[in-house]
Swiss-Prot record:
It is found in: Nucleus. Component of the spliceosome B complex. Component of splicing factor SF3B complex which is composed of at least eight subunits. SF3B associates with the splicing factor SF3A and a 12S RNA unit to form the U2 small nuclear ribonucleoproteins complex (U2 snRNP). Disulfide bonds: none annotated. Its main location: nucleus. Residues 75-94 are annotated as: Disordered. The gene is sf3b5. GO terms for biological process: mRNA splicing, via spliceosome. The keyword Nucleus applies. Belongs to the SF3B5 family. Involved in pre-mRNA splicing as a component of the splicing factor SF3B complex, a constituent of the spliceosome. SF3B complex is required for 'A' complex assembly formed by the stable binding of U2 snRNP to the branchpoint sequence (BPS) in pre-mRNA. Sequence independent binding of SF3A/SF3B complex upstream of the branch site is essential, it may anchor U2 snRNP to the pre-mRNA. This is Splicing factor 3B subunit 5. It comes from Dictyostelium discoideum.
Length: 94
């Protein structure tokens, strides 16, 4: 197996195993959501970030952690509506 095929198979394995590693058909919204969730989880994992944010927001560290966790549910808002082209074609034929 050539080096290129090996790299492609390793990439496919990572994409199947871990959420957020992306794929060829990923949408912009999905990619941004993964980026925001990665950042927010990093903030939660580092206590110095939580301390900094708690001082800046004048909140307790626990409250900042809770607020950050709730932001992770939908960090970029709802997904945009996808326009279905098949309905447009059917409407034009009628």
């Amino acid at each position: 197996m050539s080096e290129r095929e090996s790299l492609n198979s390793q990439l496919e394995h990572l994409q199947m195993r871990y959420v957020g590693t992306g794929h060829a058909d990923i949408s912009k919204h999905e990619w941004l959501t993964n980026q925001h969730r990665d950042s927010l989880s990093s903030f939660i994992g580092h206590s110095s970030f939580l301390s900094l944010f708690s001082i800046a927001e004048n909140e307790s560290v626990g409250r900042v952690r809770y607020n950050t966790l709730t932001k992770m549910i939908s960090p970029c808002g709802p997904a945009p509506k996808i326009k279905d082209n098949t309905m447009d074609k059917e409407e034009k034929n009628d």
